[in-house]
Amino acid sequence: MKVRWSRTLPAQPSSVTVIKDAAGRYFASFVLDTDPAADATRMPDTGQAVGIDLGVAHFAVLSDGTKIESPRFLRRAEKKLKKAQRELSRKQKGSKNREKARLKVARAHAKVADARHEFHHQLSTQLIRDNQAIGVEELAVNGLARTRLAKSVHDAGWSAFVHMLEYKAARYGRTLVKIGRFEPTSQTCSACGTKDGPKPLHVRQWTCTACGTLHDRDHNAAINVKTAAGLAASACGAPVRPGLVPAQRAETGRHGSPPETCAA
């Protein structure tokens, strides 16, 4: 079998598993031991901390005001996916042409999933590289998936993104704090701390009734996420889940992660 190497393996693998996906593609998953110290030295301490507000209008808004647009991979591919699905439905069951059409549909969906996966990887790596500590809100994804926002929620893939942040933070000695989903991040003024009450989703800006500060809804929420996670003062690189760290979903095996200590 021909293999396309994306990088050199860091160690001799102890086993390899060959996987065939629904789109007819083959992948080889290697199990090997890595040096935890080498991972830690690749990501030196930054002393920076950030809060992240995940959403639909923007994929993420950071506490420093950075807004990351949602790529909307699924919505951009909808016409092509629907066309491929219609062609599949017209083919006779059990025929070779139907199998070809099925593979075409599967590959179209795989292309969307791959693009989303790559976007998550690039953004999560950037955030882990730039920040010693990260705060993110736990989202009720299952509940949102039953609303009119279901397609946008599925397209964003928040759970997979947060999972990447978790395993990369553990691997590279970063601190990741997840705050409760019921924390009133969108209701609280980040300037004075006054809780201003619930606000419908269409309200993108609001003015605090106590101090008069005009807030961008998502930026304000990101600042509150950072504060609620206890990251506002400083990031010190405290120990992050020392020991074995589960590999991400697309990988097999486990990674070693060293404990980190905060300098006095």
Regions found by a protein language model. Give the residues of each.
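"…together with the soluble PPM/PP2C metallo-phosphatase catalytic core" -> "…together
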Residues: 1
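Helix/loop segments that flank and initiate small ligand/metal-binding modules
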Residues: 4, 29, 167
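A structural detector for beta-sheet-dominated domains
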Residues: 4-6, 19
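Short linear motifs in intrinsically disordered
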Residues: 6-9, 48-52, 195-199
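Short, flexible, glycine/charge-rich loop motifs used to bind or transfer phosphoryl groups or to couple energy/partner
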Residues: 6-7, 39-41, 124-125, 178, ...
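Alpha-helix initiation/capping motif
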Residues: 6-8, 70-71, 95, 140, ...
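Substrate-contacting helices/loops that form the catalytic groove of nucleic-acid
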Residues: 11-14, 21-162, 234-264
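Positively charged, low-complexity nucleic-acid-binding target-recognition regions
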Residues: 152, 156-264
